[in-house]
């Protein structure tokens, strides 16, 4: 984590100089590869493998990531446009160093019982890391690979919000709100805003379900995420006829992104939690990287699907996206119970706890 953070900070500072652009990108790529999977796996290490609170912990982590994504264009973008991009990229480097400082000093603020628990786990984990991969581990890895493949379908549809949905919004939405012409680019801010608003709501809802022993398993939550994503594009399918040849209300877009974001929160952070629960200790970071790679392939597939936007027509295109999402949801729901058996877990993968 430290090495990755410092490499990214150096990369951001190098971006301030135009001649260093490509070496800076290399530093950012290498740094992100070290930083992201390892930090994510450490979130899981704060809890026991079967602890139901992991899903909610990753939700909080995910909210923090998106808070940074919301702030970065406001701070770095404003500095870049007003004072020059040297300052914008320099601010990003400073922000990375501030984040590392918070990470370093925050490690000393863990509760005493958690520190003792982590020390006990550290001893056990040291032994486990040197143990050979078992047949049970291989079956779990195979299950994770399968879920990563299904995850590609989710991201292929989800990433249309920055692609074809933006094109549709530019041409079919009336951006005039009470006499104020809203820049269409502001649409891209809806998703991080909704993540910040919905995260505490969904987290509390899961806690409420946990107290009643009705909290869904991680795989079921991911199925719900795909289901919500499909519903969001069914909304788009319906509004095409309602809007017709004219322009529609901005609320169509807001409602679609709201449902789409709820689907994201049911899948993305939960997927991170699921990988943390099932991965062999020596492979947690690598398998986290594999999970992130599924979104990479999802983005590639999203670009391919986007090529059908003009040729299929809007209604057929949105129905296709909804169908892909709903099929992925069905796959998640169907494999939920077999996966629990495949993972050799007699109890639920989450073993819901009342304590938040």
Predicted regions, residues:
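Structural signature of the two symmetry-related core transmembrane helices
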Residues: 1-14, 18, 217-235
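Helix-loop junctions at membrane interfaces in 12-TM secondary transporters
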Residues: 14-25, 235-254
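Helical-face signature of the major facilitator-like transporter fold
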Residues: 21, 25-33, 151, 155, ...
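Cytoplasmic helix-loop-helix junction between adjacent transmembrane helices
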Residues: 33-63
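Intracellular loop-helix junctions on the cytosolic face of multi-pass helical membrane proteins
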Residues: 49-50, 76-183, 202, 206-212, ...
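Loop-to-transmembrane helix entry
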Residues: 53-60, 165, 172-197, 211-224, ...
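Glycine-rich segments within core transmembrane alpha-helices of 12-TM secondary carriers
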Residues: 53-81, 88-99, 188-195, 285-302
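A membrane-interface helix-boundary motif in multi-pass transporters
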Residues: 78-94, 215-220, 248, 307-327
């Amino acid at each position: 984590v430290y090495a990755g953070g410092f490499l990214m900070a150096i990369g951001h500072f190098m971006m301030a100089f135009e001649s260093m652009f490509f070496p800076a990108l290399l530093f950012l790529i290498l740094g992100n590869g070290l930083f992201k999977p390892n930090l994510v796996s450490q979130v899981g290490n704060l809890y026991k493998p079967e602890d139901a609170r992991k899903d909610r912990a990753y939700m909080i982590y995910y909210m923090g990531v998106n808070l940074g994504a919301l702030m970065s264009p406001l701070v770095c973008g404003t500095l870049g446009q007003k004072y020059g991009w040297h300052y914008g990229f320099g601010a990003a480097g400073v922000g990375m160093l501030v984040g590392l400082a918070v990470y370093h000093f925050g490690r000393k603020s863990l509760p005493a019982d958690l520190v003792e628990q982590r020390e006990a786990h550290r001893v056990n984990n040291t032994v486990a890391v040197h143990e050979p991969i078992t047949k049970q581990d291989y079956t779990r890895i195979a299950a994770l690979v399968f879920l990563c493949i299904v995850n590609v379908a989710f991201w292929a549809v989800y990433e249309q919000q920055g692609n074809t949905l933006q094109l549709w919004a530019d041409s079919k939405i009336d951006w005039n709100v009470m006499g104020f012409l809203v820049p269409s680019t502001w649409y891209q801010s809806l998703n991080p805003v909704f993540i910040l608003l919905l995260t505490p709501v969904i987290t509390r809802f899961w806690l409420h379900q946990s107290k009643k022993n009705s909290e869904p398993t991680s795989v079921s939550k991911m199925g719900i995420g795909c289901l919500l994503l499909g519903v969001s594009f069914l909304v788009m399918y319906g509004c095409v006829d309602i809007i017709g040849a004219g322009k529609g209300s901005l609320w169509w877009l807001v409602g679609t992104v709201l449902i789409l974001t709820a689907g994201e929160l049911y899948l993305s952070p939960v997927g991170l939690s699921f990988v943390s629960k099932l991965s062999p200790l020596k492979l947690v970071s690598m398998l986290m990287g594999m999970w992130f790679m599924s979104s990479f392939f999802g983005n590639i597939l999203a670009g391919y699907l986007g090529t059908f936007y003009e040729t299929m027509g809007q209604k057929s295109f949105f129905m296709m996206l909804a169908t892909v999402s709903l099929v992925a949801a069905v796959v998640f729901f169907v494999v939920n119970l077999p996966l629990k058996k495949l993972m050799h877990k007699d109890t639920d993968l989450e073993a819901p706890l009342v304590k938040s």
